[in-house]
Amino acid sequence: MSEVRRPSSSQPAADGAIRHDWTREEAEALYALPFPDLMFRAQSVHRRHFDPTRLETASLLSIKTGGCPEDCGYCSQSAHYDTGLKATKLMDRDTVVATAQRAKAAGAERFCMAAAWRSPKDRDLDQVCDMVSAVKDLGMETCVTLGMLTPPQAQRLKQAGLDFYNHNVDTSPEFYDRIITTRTLQDRIDTLAHVRDAGIKVCCGGIIGMGEAVDDRLGMMVLLANLGAHPDSVPINMWNEVKGVPVNDTAARPDPIALVRLIAVTRIMMPQSVVRLSAGRQYMSDELQSLCLLAGANSIFIGDVLLTTANPQADRDAALLARLGMTSALSVRPAAATAPSETADSSLVA
């Protein structure tokens, strides 16, 4: 099975050396380029580092849902808000492994496990490590997102065979305090450092559509690009409306072309990172998703649910890849024939 090619850090970047000194002004200048010029530049960078016809596919499972003590204003799993979500205990290992087996059969190459914690307790971490080892035995890449980690906890996950750790910065430094008050941005950056020091690959991105300005979206990418090492994966999530959370009061639907521009800028600034088109795809037309892939996105989540929100059905994804002439583990599955999308407005959830 072919894989998304992950270049080594020694390879030169298409627009020059890998940089960690990007400015807001440079990001804004890229974003403001005429659309054809921006897309050409992003696609040129993409082709120097990745196979542009190859898409990475991952599956996401909530192994512990709800009851989180953090007050993230977008999250259905926060105990601070009445979202109607029932908290659950940590899922047992056998159930997780069975779900991973189904995900692999459906075309997923990576299996991501998420727990709604501020930070894991050591006894819970031991169980998660067992899950990681068992999923690795299936021949899948593994990723977890468990909240903040200490250096010893990161080392323990590495010993269990963990490939990726997801810990998003969520938004720009300027907008951050309007979304979260129980965990600082520096807390997040510290955890990213612990993960990287342990030898685990970093998955780190954020959310758009919470009421932030375009400058905030670019500021988030500048923050990520100026870390000591670029994230190995950069997930870009679109805000999905959630009952009872305060972000509902500020959320604004992103313009579809603005999303494509952001992905293109991300690809140029972090040329060797896998850019994942994450939450919100169920509200995107096939045409908009195709533009996102052309701009440099090269990974998606598959499966009908992402944690607590909907996701496109796998058959729709497989049919789109077939129409585009692109490949992934998903594309080897028989795809149900579907008519071309007739969605005209490419609307996104805010």
Swiss-Prot record:
Entry-linked Pfam families: BATS, Radical_SAM
SMART domains from the UniProt entry: BATS, Elp3
Protein EC: 2.8.1.6
PANTHER family: BIOTIN SYNTHASE, BIOTIN SYNTHASE, MITOCHONDRIAL
Oligomeric and partner information: Homodimer.
Single GO MF descriptor: iron ion binding
Record field: catalytic activity: (4R,5S)-dethiobiotin + (sulfur carrier)-SH + 2 reduced [2Fe-2S]-[ferredoxin] + 2 S-adenosyl-L-methionine = (sulfur carrier)-H + biotin + 2 5'-deoxyadenosine + 2 L-methionine + 2 oxidized [2Fe-2S]-[ferredoxin]
HAMAP family recorded: BioB
Gene3D superfamilies attached to this UniProt entry: Aldolase class I
Protein encoded by which gene: bioB
Co-factor remark: Binds 1 [4Fe-4S] cluster. The cluster is coordinated with 3 cysteines and an exchangeable S-adenosyl-L-methionine. Binds 1 [2Fe-2S] cluster. The cluster is coordinated with 3 cysteines and 1 arginine.
Key words of the record: 2Fe-2S, 4Fe-4S, Biotin biosynthesis, Iron, Iron-sulfur, Metal-binding, S-adenosyl-L-methionine, Transferase
Record carries keyword Iron-sulfur: yes
Residue positions binding [4Fe-4S] cluster: C68, C72, C75
Binding site for [2Fe-2S] cluster: C112, C143, C203, R276
Function: Catalyzes the conversion of dethiobiotin (DTB) to biotin by the insertion of a sulfur atom into dethiobiotin via a radical-based mechanism.
Pathway field: Cofactor biosynthesis; biotin biosynthesis; biotin from 7,8-diaminononanoate: step 2/2
Biological process annotations from GO: biotin biosynthetic process
Sequence similarity: Belongs to the radical SAM superfamily. Biotin synthase family.
Alphabetized NCBIfam families for the sequence: bioB
Protein known as: Biotin synthase
Domain Radical SAM core: 53-281
Cofactor: [4Fe-4S] cluster; [2Fe-2S] cluster
